[in-house]
Each structure stands twice: as C-alpha cells, then as structure tokens.
Amino acid sequence: MVQRWLYSTNAKDIAVLYFMLAIFSGMAGTAMSLIIRLELAAPGSQYLHGNSQLFNGAPTSAYISLMRTALVLWIINRYLKHMTNSVGANFTGTMACHKTPMISVGGVKCYMVRLTNFLQVFIRITISSYHLDMVKQVWLFYVEVIRLWFIVLDSTGSVKKMKDTNNTKGNTKSEGSTERGNSGVDRGMVVPNTQMKMRFLNQVRYYSVNNNLKMGKDTNIELSKDTSTSDLLEFEKLVMDNMNEENMNNNLLSIMKNVDMLMLAYNRIKSKPGNMTPGTTLETLDGMNMMYLNKLSNELGTGKFKFKPMRMVNIPKPKGGMRPLSVGNPRDKIVQEVMRMILDTIFDKKMSTHSHGFRKNMSCQTAIWEVRNMFGGSNWFIEVDLKKCFDTISHDLIIKELKRYISDKGFIDLVYKLLRAGYIDEKGTYHKPMLGLPQGSLISPILCNIVMTLVDNWLEDYINLYNKGKVKKQHPTYKKLSRMIAKAKMFSTRLKLHKERAKGPTFIYNDPNFKRMKYVRYADDILIGVLGSKNDCKMIKRDLNNFLNSLGLTMNEEKTLITCATETPARFLGYNISITPLKRMPTVTKTIRGKTIRSRNTTRPIINAPIRDIINKLATNGYCKHNKNGRMGVPTRVGRWTYEEPRTIINNYKALGRGILNYYKLATNYKRLRERIYYVLYYSCVLTLASKYRLKTMSKTIKKFGYNLNIIENDKLIANFPRNTFDNIKKIENHGMFMYMSEAKVTDPFEYIDSIKYMLPTAKANFNKPCSICNSTIDVEMHHVKQLHRGMLKATKDYITGRMITMNRKQIPLCKQCHIKTHKNKFKNMGPGM
C-alpha cells in the first residue's frame, strides 16, 4: 500500500497520501502544542529547563528561519526523487515520489521543481534574504539551488520520441494533434510503475537537461539531434537578474540568436496587419518557416545580420504639417521584437513612475488618472511639447545610456546597425541619418523612453528643490474673523461673522512659503502642475529648456504653454484639464488643533472630453456636417460604406463609437459625450443604410429595419444598433473601478515569465503542423493574410480564404506547392472535397 501511494500518479492515491500526512502533522502539532502549554503553565520544572525550554528554542530570527528552510530544501533535493505534473492530478504541482535515481529527468540529480508553485515562493525568500544582507555562504547556496531549479524547470525537452519496448499496442507517436486546445506537441514523461516498466504518458510536460539520461535497460528513447534551442532559460535568468536595478547585463546576443526567442517574437507580431506591408523589399511574413528562423539565428550569432533600409512615407498631422513614418521590413521586425523584449526587461524597472508611454500596463489613461489624483490644488499648468523629439535624439546619447547597463558589445552593435540602417524616401533616394530614431521601428519607443528617463530624473530632482513648506498660511482676514467669533457672546453676532468668514478664502492662495510641483509624461508630451506663481512657471520652463538643449532636444516654444488652471483648460492626451475656481469649491467643517474651522475643500481636477473637437473630427471624416445656420454635428451618410453589407456597416459604426468612448471613459462629462456620440453615429448609420437601399428618408429606413436597425439573416439576428449599444462602457468613477477595468495592473515578474512560456508551445506547434491542404510535412511554411472580414465570407470564391475566415485564423501552414497554388487562386471555386 505504501509503494502504491509513493509511486502512483493517480489523483486519488496522492490525495490519500497527503491526507495521511496532514493527519500525522496535526497529531504532531497537537502534541508539541500540549508540551509548550505545560511549559508555559509551570516554566522551568518539567520537561526542558532554563534556556533549553522548548518555547524558548522556537526560531525568532528571520535568518534562522531562512537557514532552516534551506536545510529542509537541501534534504528534499538530496533524498527525494520525484516527477511533476502527473496525469490525472488535481492541479499543477501535485507530485509523485520515486526512489530509484535512474528515472530522474536530471540524470544524476533530481531537484524539486514545483510544489504548489513553490519556485516563486523560494525566489521571493531569496530576494528577502538579499535585502536582509544574509551571510554570504547562505546566499550563494540559495543562488545555486535556484540555478539548479531553473535547469530542471526551464530547459527544453530534447526528447522527440519515447517508446516502451514492452508495449504491444504499437509505437507511440510524438506528433501532437492540431485540434484547438492542444498546443500541437504531445509532451511525455517517463514514469515507472511498481514493476519499473516505462510508460509514455500523453500531455505531460517532460523537462530534460541532459542528453545522457540514465534510464532502465528496457527503455528506448530517441533523442533529437537539434540542440539549437535552449528554451527560455537565459531570458528568464535575465528577468530575474534585472530585479536588481544595478545589474550589468552580458550575453544578450546569445538570447537574441535563440531560435525559441525568434519563434516567440514571430508569434507576437504575426497577426498585425502592418507586417503584411512590404518595406524596401517584397518580403513579408508570408512564407515564414523554420529554415528562415534557423538562418536568422546563425546570422545573429556570427554578426552577419544587417537591417535593411526602411521605406519612408509622409503622413499628415492633425494640426498641419507632415509626419515622416518609416515602413520597415516585416522580417526584420522579428529581430526588433526580441530586442524590444530584452530592452524592456532591462530598463522598464529603471524608469520613472510618472512615465506612461510605451510601457507594460501603462497607457494614456493611466497618465490621465495620475493627473486626476495628483494635480489637485495646482493653479498653473505647463504644457511641454518637444520639437521633433524622435528625429533629433542623438545616437551617441542612446548608446551611452545603453552601455550603463549592457556590456554585450554584440548587442550594442546590433542597436547601432538599426539606428544607421537608413531609409529610402518616396523619390527612391537613400538617406543615412546621423540623428534620430526611425519612426516605425519596434524599439524606437523604448529607446526614446530610455533617453527621456534623463528628463524624468531631472524633473524629480527639480521638484525636490522647488517644493517648500508643510501647510499653507491662513489668510489674515480669516484669522481676524476667527478671533472675533471666539470673543462674540451673542449667537446672532457669531452667525453673522461665520457667514462673513465663509465668503472669503481660508488660506493665502499664493503663499510664497508653500509651493508644490507635479508632472506626468507620456512619450514626449509632458504636463507640469504648479502651485505657485506665474514667474515660477516661467523659471521652470526656462530651466527645463536649458536641460533639454544639453541633451540635444528642443522645446517647441509655440506649443509649450503656461495656462491658468482655473481659467483656461490645458490639453493633455486629448483631454481638457482644469481646476475648479476657489469661489466654486465646496466648503467643509474641520477640526484642526482643537479649533473648529470652516474651509473650502480642494477638489480633484476637472477632466473633460473635448466634445466640440471630437464632433469636428467626425465631420472631417464624413460622419456629420455643420449647417450654415451654425448647428454642429448634423448626421450625414458615409458614401464609402454604401457598398458594404448592412451587418458590416452597423458593426463599423459601433466599433467607432466604442473606440471613442473607451478612451474617454475617465472624462467628467462622459455621459454627455456618450449621448452625443450615439446621436451622430446612429442617425449617420440610418442615412447610410437609406442610401444603400435607396429609401430616401430615415423614416422609411427605420420602418424597414426597425428602430434598433435589426439585420436578420436566415431567421437569425446578426447585427443591430439598439439605444443601449454603448451603455456597457461605464464611466470610471473611482480608483477601484480604474484598477479593475484599465491596464493599470502591476506585472509580477514570475507571471510575466509564465505568460511568455505559455505562448512558446503554441508558437512551436504552428511550425510543426502538416500542410492544411495535402497533409504533407515537407517544406511547410506559414500562409498569411492581412485582414479577415466576416462580411467577405459569402462574397469570396476562394475556399482557402473562406475557411480562414470561418476559423478566424490569419495564418495556416501550407507546403510550398500548395502555398504557390493558393496565391495563384488555383483553389478557387473548390470545396471541402478538394
């Protein structure tokens, strides 16, 4: 029975074993508790004496607790051989124990990998011990245990086929099913039964760190000769090392050339429509295969990889002028994505909490929310705008900042190659820039953030110097009336004085001895809130301009504005931000130092959506118009959509409305904006449908489709535009709603590692699937489409495209021959029987 419990991977057997252990632990704990209670009742007389008393020997130091934890873990690692993720187990972390060392996946040694996610717990203990400045030997021992755990947990399984020679049912296939829900690769684990016969178990993760595994005589294991992938061990180590912000990073190029990292990067960018747009060559992500990734890995390892020049196009700015945009080679973006992941891992924790642009779990909304929470009480705003920030950043400054934390010359050279790759303009002329970041590169935003972190550090130091005073000084009139109230004996006199005092200010509005400064940055847009005088704002603007000039950046004097917070709203990230005037602030009764006073309560900033500007933007794009009599936002038809299906027309309008309202759901005037947006988009949709069906009037259209614009197909409602379409987009009222509904969530490094590892099996499976048409496994590559339109399903005659729309897949594996035939429309008008 004991052997059954120890060797079984059945959930019930393991549950019984754990239940017995729990009972034993409870009995032992009860006995120890009884002894301690007896000692406490009559100390120093019965069981243990003096300093040897049991309750005195309990560990009271964090150091002793950590050392004992290490001792227990060492004993487990030394004497307990086990496997993880058992078949039929209730949850990940249930382990089956084994005595024979030959079955250990580590070969010679077997280490504890996971027990109720204990790896994360132990790493956190390690970090705690680091901050507690533990003994050096204990710290080194912890690091070694962590390293050995990583080897077992994270190394790629190099086993391709495992077969039980005693199995009479035939060979066990290693190819995985390609059905949805399966990662595409069936993993296996060697688990012995009581007779020590090896079995192959499907869908159990197998970790291998050594090709020279010690196995039983009857075990037949074919090892893969491909050792080019090492899973994500090095990247995970990079994540853990950079929890220390002063860490110097090396061997980054070895992470870059890892095929698994390249595969993961491809998987992250493959569905973006822009990656089907060619750059200066005709190559896109269409036709991607493992051969190209292996070639890319070799070029990165040997230093032969070069970024191709980008294609430069000019797009108009909303307020006039043209913005240059670089269109890069889609296949170069695979390398850029790996670089972005590495740079993000190294530098994100070093950036300011006031920086919200192009960062994980940061967005425009988190920046606006910080303004809402932190800028109350400001009486001046400084809207800082940098002139062509991306185009004027010095390459030498970028490299200098990278070298502060990166010592890998190969990686630095790769960044330098990207910066100097150049571009080809619309006339076909090649340019090699000496300044600036290519707008369109995946790593340009984070490189900009790295440089702008210098500005963040300067502003934070400046704030510490500028802020002064603890509390505002009370207004003389307020103090005078307070003394009169204290001396007044008649109730009517007191009431009269109270009313007179409430009309005036409580504190000196511009107290020279009380100053405050706040700031928020999103990329190159900075908003500074100042509690002080206008001269202070001019001084801040001048000093900031001087510092920007020292970095080679230029402040746009025309767009950098100093505005009175209570009179003129500041425009930041599309919101109008203002402060409630002092006279309109609500009054509240407070007790300060035993005295009851009535003061005006400072309110949060008013964050309004610029409804007039939004309507003007809709008018520019043809959704509404302005009448000659001055009426704004009169809905009109959208002629370019009259050729679409009615379902597509309605869904386009709803998507536009959701996009606007989701962005402005922090606005104080959100409900008014929602009603206005619904009015314009709904009646514009009605007029567009009227134009499509030549119904001439809105009343005839509503009579045909109903007030909710119900589109029915085969007695099934497929689209509508009801009155409550946008009611599910709620205005964010408080911080709890914001944390729940927005992107402002703290990223745990362990969760980040797990999320990346979760994506890797799926990415690998895509390249291991056979051709979706002929089921061939030779020369399989990925067929890409730029967009999938559900409305095209009936109109398309291409069976392959129709199936991709039905499956909602932008990529499918095809062999070389079928891929060529697909692009030549050879499968047109064919059906499932092809």
UniProtKB/Swiss-Prot annotation:
Ranges for region Disordered: 162-188
Cellular localization per UniProt: Mitochondrion
Keyword Nucleotide-binding among UniProt keywords: no
GO terms, molecular function: RNA-directed DNA polymerase activity
GO biological process assignments: homing of group II introns; mRNA processing; RNA-templated DNA biosynthetic process
Biased composition (Polar residues): 167-181
GO cellular component: mitochondrion
Keywords from the named record: Mitochondrion
A Pfam cross-reference name: RVT_1
All copies of domain Reverse transcriptase, residue ranges: 296-577
Keyword Mitochondrion: yes
Miscellaneous comment: This protein is coded in group-II intron 1 of OXI3 (COX1).
Protein name per UniProt: Putative COX1/OXI3 intron 1 protein
Record gene name: AI1
